[in-house]
C-alpha cells in the first residue's frame, strides 16, 4: 500500500536535494519516480521565472491551457475572491481544499513563496484509497467505479458540454483516478440534472475521510525553489488553509506527457483524447 509510511521509508525514490541535475537526468528521474510512487520533489534551491519554468516543462511534455485565455503557467495564490464571484477558483483562495485531481497527466508545482502559516501540501496515492475502500466499504468502491455527473467548470466556457459523466476510479489495472468534488456538487445543485444518490453522497464523504487520515496522506511543506512533479492520474492532492497575507505564491503547470497511460473511453469528454502518450487535458481556448 502506498501510504505515508511507504513515503517515509522510500524517500530516496521521490525526493532529491542535489544540484547536479541536467535536463536529461531530471526527466529520467521524473518519469521513474512518478511511475513508481506518484510524485517527485526536487529541492533545486532556485526560483525560476515563468518563462524558464515553461522551458523546463516543455522538455518533459506539452504544457496545457489552464484558462480560457490560454494561461500555461498559473499563479496559485489568494486573490481574495468571494465564493460567489465567477472568477473564484479553489487555487485562487486561501481556503483548505478537498482532495482532488486536475486536468492533466503530470502536474508541476514550483514554490516561489511559502505562506507564513499553513498552506501545507497533502498527497494520497490512488492505490492506498482503493485498498482501504476494498477492505472497509466495498459497496462504496463499486459506486465510485460508476459515472458521476460533473458540471462544466466556470473557467471552461469554450467547452460546448454543460456537463459530462466520469467515474472516480476509471481503470482498475492502472488505478486511474479523477475527482473534482466541487463540480460534482454543482451538478447536484443544478435543478435540470439528476441528484446524487445516497450511496454516491456517502462515497464522496468516505473518500475524503480516508484521505484526511494522518497515516494515509503524505504532508509536504514546499520551500522557495522546490519543484514538485505529480502523477495526476494516480494521486489526489490537497492543501491546508493558509494565512491570507498575500505571501504564498506557487507557479502551476499542467502537462500532457509522452509516457502517459491509455485512459478509459469515459475520460474522452474531459481529456479530449485517451490514447497513451496523446496530448490531452487542460481547458479549450476561448
What are these regions (language model features)?
Residues 31, 35-72:
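Long, mid-chain structured domain cores
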Residues 1-22, 28, 35, 70-224, ...:
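Active-site environment of non-heme Fe oxygenases that use a 2-His-1-carboxylate facial triad
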Amino acid at each position: 500500500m502506498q501510504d505515508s509510511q511507504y513515503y517515509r521509508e522510500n524517500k530516496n525514490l521521490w525526493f532529491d536535494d542535489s544540484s547536479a541535475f541536467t535536463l536529461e537526468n531530471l526527466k529520467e528521474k521524473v518519469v521513474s519516480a512518478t511511475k513508481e510512487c506518484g510524485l517527485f520533489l526536487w529541492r533545486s534551491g532556485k526560483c525560476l521565472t515563468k518563462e524558464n519554468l515553461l522551458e523546463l516543462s516543455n522538455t518533459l511534455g506539452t504544457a496545457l491551457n489552464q484558462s480560457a485565455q490560454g494561461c500555461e503557467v498559473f499563479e496559485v495564490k489568494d486573490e481574495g475572491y468571494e465564493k460567489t464571484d465567477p472568477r473564484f477558483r479553489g487555487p485562487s483562495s486561501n481556503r483548505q481544499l478537498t482532495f482532488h485531481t486536475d486536468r492533466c497527466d503530470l502536474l508541476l508545482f514550483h514554490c516561489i513563496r511559502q505562506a507564513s502559516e499553513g498552506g501545507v501540501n497533502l498527497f494520497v496515492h490512488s492505490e492506498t484509497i482503493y485498498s482501504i475502500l476494498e477492505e472497509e466499504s466495498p459497496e462504496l468502491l463499486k459506486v465510485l467505479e460508476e459515472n458521476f455527473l460533473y458540471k462544466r467548470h466556470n473557467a471552461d466556457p469554450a467547452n460546448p458540454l454543460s456537463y459530462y459523466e466520469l467515474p472516480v476510479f476509471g481503470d482498475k489495472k492502472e488505478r486511474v483516478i479523477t475527482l473534482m468534488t466541487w463540480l460534482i456538487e454543482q451538478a447536484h445543485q443544478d435543478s435540470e440534472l439528476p441528484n446524487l444518490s445516497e450511496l454516491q453522497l456517502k462515497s464522496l464523504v468516505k473518500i475524503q475521510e480516508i484521505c484526511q487520515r494522518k497515516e494515509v496522506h503524505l504532508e509536504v511543506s514546499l520551500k522557495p525553489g522546490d519543484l514538485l512533479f505529480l502523477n495526476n492520474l494516480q494521486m489526489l492532492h490537497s492543501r491546508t488553509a493558509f494565512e491570507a497575507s498575500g505571501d504564498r505564491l506557487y507557479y502551476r503547470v499542467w502537462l500532457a506527457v509522452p509516457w502517459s497511460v491509455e485512459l478509459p473511453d469515459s475520460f474522452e469528454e474531459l481529456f479530449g483524447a485517451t490514447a497513451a502518450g496523446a496530448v490531452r487535458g487542460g481547458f479549450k481556448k476561448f
